[in-house]
Curated annotation (Swiss-Prot):
Name of protein: Large ribosomal subunit protein bL25
Keywords assigned by UniProt, alphabetized: Ribonucleoprotein, Ribosomal protein, RNA-binding, rRNA-binding
Subunit note: Part of the 50S ribosomal subunit; part of the 5S rRNA/L5/L18/L25 subcomplex. Contacts the 5S rRNA. Binds to the 5S rRNA independently of L5 and L18.
GO CC annotations on file: ribonucleoprotein complex; ribosome
Presence of the UniProt keyword Ribonucleoprotein in the record: yes
Keyword Secreted included in the entry's annotation: no
Superkingdom: Bacteria
UniProt family annotation: Belongs to the bacterial ribosomal protein bL25 family.
GO molecular function (one): rRNA binding
Reported function: This is one of the proteins that binds to the 5S RNA in the ribosome where it forms part of the central protuberance.
Amino acid sequence: ALTVETKKRPIGSKPXALRRVGFILNXAPY
């Protein structure tokens, strides 16, 4: 799931923020 989010959104822009969004979408407890 994380790979899909990475491909969908440019990590170079804001990793952090993208990581948070990815975790939330995955459903992770973050």
